[in-house]
Amino acid sequence: MQNTDTTKYIIHSKINADGVIERPDIVGAIFGQTEGLLGADLDLRDLQKTGRIGRIEVMVTAKGGKTKGNIFVPSSLDKVETSILAASLETIDRVGPCSAKIEVFQVEDVRAVKRKKIIERAKLIFTKMFDETVPESQELADEVRQSVRVDELTHYGKSRIPCGPNVLNSDAIIIVEGRADILNLLRYGIKNTICVGGTNIPPEVAELTKKKTVTAFTDGDRGGELIIRELLQVADIDYVARAPDGKCVEDLVQKEIIRSLRRKVPVEQIIEKYGIQEKESEDSACRLERVSKRKMRAPEVVPRIAEKKLHKRVKVHRVSPKTEAYEEESPEEMEEAVTEKIPEKAPEKVSEKSLEKTPAAAEKVEARKAVPKSPVMARPVPAARVPRGKPSAEKVSAVKVPGGEAVRVSPAPARQVPIAPVSPEAARFRPHVDALKGTLTARILDSDDKVIEEIAVRDLASRLKTYRDNVKSVVFDGVITQRLVDIASSNAIKNLIGVKIGNIAKVPADMEVLTSAML
């Protein structure tokens, strides 16, 4: 008996007979007319006894004196032997007393059907029955490292602000933007970190900065700049470190983190860079907004000086209409003793007309200062250079110091930065600049100034590398760096518009680099 599990092929054939015949007649004709035809190895009776050939199935119908039907022969032989056996069936020309014809029309591969079922079932098992894949070695290491970092993460204050484990014990702390930044720094062993969670600085963090040496470490985008501005107003920081342009602290590797922290700058330079001005109090007298902890050292003993006038040397520059070059005067012309006490009142403004009437006032800038009765001394305000041939009247204001008196100071005149001429065609980018203001996003434009894609500024450099010739202009809410200029030049980009221009050494002649202020 043929085992269906071992069947490899099924021979499909059809029979036509001129007469009425039945199944036993057809089976007898198959065994009788093929006996001894193919030799002892392929004799159907022997093959059926050994299980190489299965049960022969016959399905016939008789109609109008003729018989038609199909014959199915299962085989576990190989392809060659099965083909020989199928061909031998077509040699049968008579069944009983009737003439007949057998024709093979298909050899079915049973294993192919099984393979299809196996594939379909395997797809179902793979998609629905595997809950999780086997992780790779790197994934296992990252998971263990991440769990250790999460265990080390602690919280500070009633607001449960995320921070590193050494924030309270360390003399110096690092302020970052979010929880992911703390986890990345913990990964490389930096544990004295605390986050602010955006531009809304928590009061606990502002109070903590008064007791520590603080370094603000922010992202290299406009959001990081806004956080620094907020910290300068509500907290007391000493240094500022920035991530590379377009990168976030949470994405930096160890080498980039160490390099950024080593390049930190004092907060005084940041105040000058961002142009943060001193605020005025309600009584219209200027007050000193902040004093750095590194410079605020209380003296041991300060003797009280009453009714005594001190002389202070102030630099004075002469203004000459003959030349426009900057030129320093001799030491005799740059020194003058000035002493005068000013009553505590609103700051005075000296108009240009009054300065024109007195030539001495147009040539010299005087700073008058009284001795404060407090240990904290007011810093001298150095006079700024005035270019020759460009005289201007200076505004005189009074700065209130803790001694109850006021000091008349002359603020340095603002530098006039020449703005490069902008072509009239560049004004067409103004709508894009206005739409992107404060969004930290970028627009990639084609030759018709149509928006191809709008992405985040942090992804701009990597995304521009994927474009080839269809990009002609880029407008973004960020700083134009040398790296962006080089990438834009390699992609034949003609216009690069940002918020401001960073340290750029060279710009291609066929590229126009503009800022939003120029438009």
Swiss-Prot record:
It catalyses: ssDNA + n NTP = ssDNA/pppN(pN)n-1 hybrid + (n-1) diphosphate. It is an enzyme of class 2 (transferase). Residues 338-356 have a biased composition (Basic and acidic residues). Keywords: DNA replication, DNA-directed RNA polymerase, Exosome, Magnesium, Metal-binding, Nucleotidyltransferase, Primosome, Transcription, Transferase. Binds two Mg(2+) per subunit. Its EC number is 2.7.7.101. This is DNA primase DnaG. It comes from Methanosarcina acetivorans (strain ATCC 35395 / DSM 2834 / JCM 12185 / C2A).
